[in-house]
Amino acid sequence: MERYESLFAQLKERKEGAFVPFVTLGDPGIEQSLKIIDTLIEAGADALELGIPFSDPLADGPTIQNATLRAFAAGVTPAQCFEMLALIRQKHPTIPIGLLMYANLVFNKGIDEFYAQCEKVGVDSVLVADVPVEESAPFRQAALRHNVAPIFICPPNADDDLLRQIASYGRGYTYLLSRAGVTGAENRAALPLNHLVAKLKEYNAAPPLQGFGISAPDQVKAAIDAGAAGAISGSAIVKIIEQHINEPEKMLAALKVFVQPMKAATRS
């Protein structure tokens, strides 16, 4: 959890925002997935947002669903994902690692056991995509017991009550949703979210990172100009993996070429 605090403090000092890529663990196989994650970090990622493959990903558009199918095809299990997380943490001791996942995967383990395992391998935050704030108590309590930041999604139409709840319960960062709907690079991030950012700040929420539909450097810059602490990009990155599925080296080179200007756009 503290890794987010030190990251945001360092970025503030350097007058930079955070660039946070999302990928599915184990896509397209364990070995290449670990190389992908190393490449993202080398190219400038400030933190990681990682998915654990799940059979029914409601919030995900087709691009990320395909990533999940590729991981399943490679035989990747949640247990192997945790082994990968431990390896990533060993290799990269300071980078914040967040999980983006679904409640069933938490229930399968038992809520407390799941967060205990997160703590053990060095995961900093968990966003459970299909658990609304009002049902989040058992999740966030277990998270805090194990020093894992509970992350909440702030939708573009959030009312005042919801903003207060998100500010009060969330730690690490706040996931600021560019728009409603499912993930996907083809639907560009829409409206400026200045008013939400201002309210979240007023209520002392964890720093907002804008996600959903972030696929170009100008959108990263726009998110930061609107007051966000950074931006999360998933589908655009996963699409690069898909396009170079049979050319592992080209894939890594293309990921680097994508991430470098995205990170550069965070520097004012």
From Swiss-Prot:
Keyword Plastid: no
Pfam families: Trp_syntA
Top-rank lineage group of the source organism: Bacteria
Transmembrane segments: none
InterPro entries noted in UniProt: Aldolase_TIM (IPR013785), RibuloseP-bd_barrel (IPR011060), Trp_synthase_alpha_AS (IPR018204), Trp_synthase_suA (IPR002028)
Active site, per annotation: 49 (proton acceptor), 60 (proton acceptor)
Reactions listed under catalytic activity: (1S,2R)-1-C-(indol-3-yl)glycerol 3-phosphate + L-serine = D-glyceraldehyde 3-phosphate + L-tryptophan + H2O
One Gene Ontology biological process: L-tryptophan biosynthetic process
PANTHER family the UniProt entry points to: TRYPTOPHAN SYNTHASE ALPHA CHAIN, CHLOROPLASTIC, TRYPTOPHAN SYNTHASE, ALPHA CHAIN
Subunit and partners: Tetramer of two alpha and two beta chains.
Physiological role: The alpha subunit is responsible for the aldol cleavage of indoleglycerol phosphate to indole and glyceraldehyde 3-phosphate.
Family: Belongs to the TrpA family.
Name under which the protein is recorded: Tryptophan synthase alpha chain
Organism of provenance: Escherichia coli (strain K12)
